[in-house]
Amino acid sequence: AARSLGVDVVAASNQVSDSALQSRTLEARQAIAQTARQITPSAVELLQGMSDQQVKGMNLVFAKDLREHRDKYLKPPLAQQIRQRGERMDKRLSDWLGPLNPAQKERVTAWSTALGEQNQQWIANRAHWQAQFSAAMAQRQSTDFAPRIEALLVDRESLWTPAYRQAFSDTEAQARSLLVDLMDQSSANQRQRLVQKIDKLRSNLQALKCLRT
């Protein structure tokens, strides 16, 4: 509760820093990893029981996913990729803060421009992960299947390509810088809306936690 209150205070007082965002990111990663670790045994059992036909269907879904992502995020010219990325971020931020002001919109454009060809590394790493998952599924009766699936679900970062590892680090730094600047440029109404959204999210998470217990 104290940690959640800290988020409220930070948002309301407009005191957002790079180090604070790094801490929150680490907490989120740890929570995601913990959840993934909890479901891994059941996932391994389910995956091992799949038939060859089901695995073939899964691989077809992977292939379709990659085609769609390449068509949407890689085929457009770079200038269009940058513009569309900025539009997607503007939409996400507006949901949390309300309409962005001109200075904030300009900062979002600068953020998207700085990321450049990040889509290329993102899609390449997605294909890399899917290929490793398919390779593991092809040997799902082997003795090392469980640890391979755990690595794919829990320790995904250990399987990233070197290029994507660097790109992800750069992307995270750019995102933190963007958020710090946006909060610095935010209005009291935007900060109030953000606190309300955080409160609602916390209530939803608490409700889910109660259902699980």
State each model region's role.
Residues 1-213:
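Charge-rich (acidic/polar
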